[in-house]
Amino acid sequence: MAIDGEKKKDPRAWDALTPSLAEWILDAIKSMGFEKMTPVQASTIPLFMGNKDVVVEAVTGSGKTLSFLIPVVEKLLRLEEPIKKHHVGAIIVSPTRELATQIHSVLTSLLAFHEPSAGALKPLEEGEKRKPSSTLRVVSQLLLGGTTTPAQDLSRFLKNSPNLLISTPGRLLELLSSPHVHCPQSSFEVLVLDEADRLLDLGFKDDLQKILSRLPKQRRTGLFSASVSEAVGEIVRVGLRNPVKIAVKVKGAGGDKMTPASLQMSYLLTPPTHKFPALLSLLSQLQPTPQKSIIYLSTCAAVDYFQPLLEAVLPKQFALVSLHGKHPPNVRQRNFSKYVAAVSPTILLTTDVAARGLDIPQVDLVVQIDPPSDPKVFLHRCGRAGRAGRKGLSVIFLQPGREEDYIPFLEIRKTPITLFKRPEISTTDDAAKILISKMRKEVLADRALYDKGQRAFVSWVQAYSKHQASSIFRVADLDWTDLGNAWALVRLPKMPELKKWEGDKTLGIKLDMSEYAYKDKVREKARRVAMEEAKNAGPYVPTEEQIARKKQREAWSQKHEKQDLKELKREKKKRKREIERLDKMTDEEKRVEQEKERELQALIEQVKRRKIEDDADEEFEGFAD
């Protein structure tokens, strides 16, 4: 019986952890606003601090970053003596520069409360070297490709002698290859692989294996992943010793869900020309106004094209920031920092570079203008909202017709989406025409936007044709006129997919292309010079090589048609041979053959069912931080 007045400790209270956390860590956590541990933190931190390898799967916004940072810091500060100069005690590997930067930022906020480590955060003067200290402290170094050279990284390492490295795989491998960087068993304590499935998706498997080969086997390892696929399982077998698996799921009425309970996932059925009017209606009607929103497009070229068009039509209170994988590293970092630091309503216009790994705080709304090519990415896009218990809304725009099959397709994968009903989003053809006219006005004002639109539309069609759910997203079903108008194009581009299309490629826009000018005077002058030279050179005569290359160009759909025709012919020949074989058999032989066929079909169905269940469990459980 409990003693009167004695209060039972909340198992998710930070001071209830065993082993207990240092007082300064409790102060740091309190300052960050984390009153209680999330389930993944409560499950992971005690095990990881207590000499266990861990494999952690959890839904998005579950607080995984602190789940490994706290144990790593505690391990380094509980050593019997400081780590030797130029020896590494811990490494955290991240798949992207942005995520590595965020992890380092959270670590810096944490270490600001530990006086010896906070002192090490101050940059050294030119030529000054970090003095050895008898006091235990954490000295970190962030390694990012594209921002510094490997030589600069090594120079900084030798100058600061960090004991904790946070890095992307390629740059880490380059540093570990130096004879001046040491990771012996006597010094090295812990390795963390964050977003392990993403590391493998991005093709870092060879780099990871080389990194593991340079580290001592006697170490603690934490693997954090949205899902433990077969490839991730291989890393687990090679790199971890008897790990404890921690899987944190969200219970729903229909069983386990792959997303937080605070996230509403919805869809709207809109033809292409109504997508942007529906977006503006959604942004205007939501109450309270979403402070941070993310809009997903399928390609980098589409982001570059639509950014100036959306800036011209968005409600005035919304700022727009773009981010995609083809931006130079400094531009990506600048734009990302601008979006995160924004205090007024801001929209991030992006591709799947922001679908995983970017821990963007307080995202209210996610809108998917284009469904992702990989169905797995759908979950991770949605998961940017509704993090850490905060309410969030995700809306995907689907075209009426075959794309509606995407709804049951997602439900099979434990990702149910519902029709968005409140507030009611209604658009009209007239409203769509007015908006398209405003966007087209921007395009007509600068030929550079025309060029961007042509490239972006071609890249979008290619992305659409490569969709993994190819039976749902079919190029053959696209309405080219509606799409061209939705994109505010003034001409449909020359592309193989439109070769046999007999519609109006001018979209009804009367335009003298010879007088269609660039805003940039230098580009416009160059265009006119080139046009004059072409006029003086006489009629264009293609070379034999150009003619041959033109003949080789085929639409994706045509290639598939040829493959299908070959497959059909093979199938017909196979059936004919089978009929001839059966004609030569006795009745008894036919009966035995039919019995074997039934058994084989039953076995195939059993394997298929098991495969579907396994895929649903493995591919769609959890999100990344």
UniProtKB/Swiss-Prot annotation:
Q: Which reaction does it catalyse?
A: ATP + H2O = ADP + phosphate + H(+)
What's a Pfam family in this record? DEAD
Query: Where does it localize?
Result: Nucleus, Nucleolus
Question: EC number(s) of the enzyme?
Answer: 3.6.4.13
Q: What InterPro entries is this protein classified in?
A: CTT_SPB4 (IPR056330), DEAD/DEAH_box_helicase_dom (IPR011545), Helicase_ATP-bd (IPR014001), Helicase_C-like (IPR001650), P-loop_NTPase (IPR027417), RNA-helicase_DEAD-box_CS (IPR000629), RNA_helicase_DEAD_Q_motif (IPR014014), SPB4-like_CTE (IPR025313)
Write out the ranges of the annotated region (Disordered): 550-597
The UniProt annotation puts motif DEAD box at 194-197
Coiled-coil residue windows: 557-614
Per UniProt, which keywords does this protein have?
A: ATP-binding, Coiled coil, Helicase, Hydrolase, Nucleotide-binding, Nucleus, Ribosome biogenesis, RNA-binding, rRNA processing
Question: Residues in domain Helicase ATP-binding?
Answer: 45-246
Q: Where does ATP bind?
A: A58, V59, T60, G61, S62, G63, K64, T65
PANTHER family assigned to the protein according to its UniProt record, in alphabetical order: RNA HELICASE (PTHR24031)
Quaternary data: Component of pre-60S ribosomal complexes.
As for family, the record states: Belongs to the DEAD box helicase family. DDX55/SPB4 subfamily.
Instruction: Give the comment on domains.
Output: The Q motif is unique to and characteristic of the DEAD box family of RNA helicases and controls ATP binding and hydrolysis.
Function as written in the Swiss-Prot or TrEMBL entry: ATP-binding RNA helicase involved in the biogenesis of 60S ribosomal subunits. Binds 90S pre-ribosomal particles and dissociates from pre-60S ribosomal particles after processing of 27SB pre-rRNA. Required for the normal formation of 18S rRNA through the processing of pre-rRNAs at sites A0, A1 and A2, and the normal formation of 25S and 5.8S rRNAs through the processing of pre-rRNAs at sites C1 and C2.
- What is this protein's record name? ATP-dependent rRNA helicase spb4
